[in-house]
């Protein structure tokens, strides 16, 4: 006997009673079947509900041949009437995300004559795929239209059409459908075959915000937040932007220009530092001209700078050159000998200095979790 789906009668039903029809073990969990349930099973891109059933924790819900199975952490007595409580914040979040996705997908598909080819309601965001090259500017335009539609607070319409009625409806669907089809409609925005749970009015979505766009296969993949998720994202973005503004002594709406100016200053300073580094590297190369094998332990610097210093000194010292830059516990290194295979030396060095890295043709680069004393001791014993 198929399970009666109370969530279709009232998606806002948070508590209910049902009779335990069957209870069977599955590993360390139990699969419980009721005569009726308000727990939504995973399907159509929407995750399953969680909650409490007769005191047992419900951690998953899925459907099999019209029967809904509740995965519980303990057994429930067959024949007993049990009380169920939905994890409502989780369910309502899913309803906001799913309804918001319908509204924007209906508008995008109509505007760009495309199909929604993929939908995943994740814990962090909603991922949607479309088989059209929709520009980011167009996505933002639809976002604005969708939010206006949401604020107009349109009612959701649910239909169970006959096969003949269904054939005449301009609805969206990602696959061929058989049996009774459920149609959810936000009039003027979307009509779609859907088995999920939705808000009753568009205003309950709150707002929608696209936060990601990328090329995907023959179209685009969009990342969307709706309702509480969108509000939390915008609130966090405002807090972070305000913090940046305070650091740069500008108003939040001027942070982009201030950061651009700061990056320009940083690039100027980097260029100046690179010039000073180059002069110092040449000085050290001259200082160690003809010195044979040379070890240099330097303050922290970028890996590229370590390599350039090692290269400069190796050209004049007539032997192996090693540069370590950092502090005790963490060094970046470069080793060069233009005329010898340094592979055996590097294997021994990495083993002794807890190093990671390598190279070829007389050059190696990496890092070592050691002290300066250990570096100098190894160098003295192996040079």
Regions found by a protein language model. Give the residues of each.
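A glycine- and charged-residue-rich anion-binding loop/surface
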Residues: 1-383
């Amino acid at each position: 006997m198929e399970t009666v789906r109370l969530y279709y009668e009232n998606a806002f039903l948070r508590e209910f009673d049902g009779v335990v029809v069957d209870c069977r073990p599955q590993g360390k969990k139990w699969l419980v079947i009721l005569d009726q349930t308000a727990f939504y099973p995973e399907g159509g891109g929407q995750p399953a509900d969680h909650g409490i059933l007769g005191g047992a924790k419900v951690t998953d819900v899925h459907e099999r041949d019209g029967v809904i199975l509740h995965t519980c952490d303990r057994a429930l007595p067959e024949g007993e009437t049990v009380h169920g409580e939905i994890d409502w914040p989780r369910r309502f979040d899913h309803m906001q995300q799913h309804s918001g996705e319908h509204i924007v997908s209906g508008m995008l598909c109509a505007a760009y004559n495309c199909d929604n080819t993929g939908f995943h309601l994740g814990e962090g965001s909603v991922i949607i795929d479309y088989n059209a090259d929709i520009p980011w500017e167009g996505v933002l335009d639809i976002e604005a239209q969708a939010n206006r539609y949401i604020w107009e607070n349109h009612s959701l319409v649910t239909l169970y059409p006959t096969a003949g009625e269904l054939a005449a409806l301009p609805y969206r669907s990602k696959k061929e459908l058989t049996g009774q089809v459920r149609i959810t409609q936000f009039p003027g925005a979307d009509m779609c075959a859907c088995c999920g749970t939705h808000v009753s009015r568009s205003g309950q979505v709150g707002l929608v915000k696209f936060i990601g766009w990328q090329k995907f296969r023959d179209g685009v993949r969009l990342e969307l937040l709706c309702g509480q998720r969108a509000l939390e994202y915008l609130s966090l973005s405002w807090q972070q932007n305000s913090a940046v503004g305070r650091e740069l002594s500008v108003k939040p709406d001027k942070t982009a220009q201030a950061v651009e100016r700061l990056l320009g200053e940083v690039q100027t300073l980097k260029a100046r530092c690179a010039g000073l580094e180059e002069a110092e590297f040449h000085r050290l190369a001259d200082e160690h001209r003809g010195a044979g094998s040379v070890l240099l332990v330097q303050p922290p610097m970028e890996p590229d700078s370590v390599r350039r210093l090692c290269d400069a000194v190796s050209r004049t010292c007539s032997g192996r050159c090693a540069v370590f830059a950092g502090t005790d516990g963490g060094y970046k290194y470069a080793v060069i000998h233009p005329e010898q295979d340094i592979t055996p030396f590097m294997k021994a060095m990495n083993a002794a200095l807890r190093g990671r890295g390598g190279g070829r043709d007389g050059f190696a680069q990496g890092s070592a979790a050691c002290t300066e004393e250990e570096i100098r001791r190894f160098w003295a014993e192996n040079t």
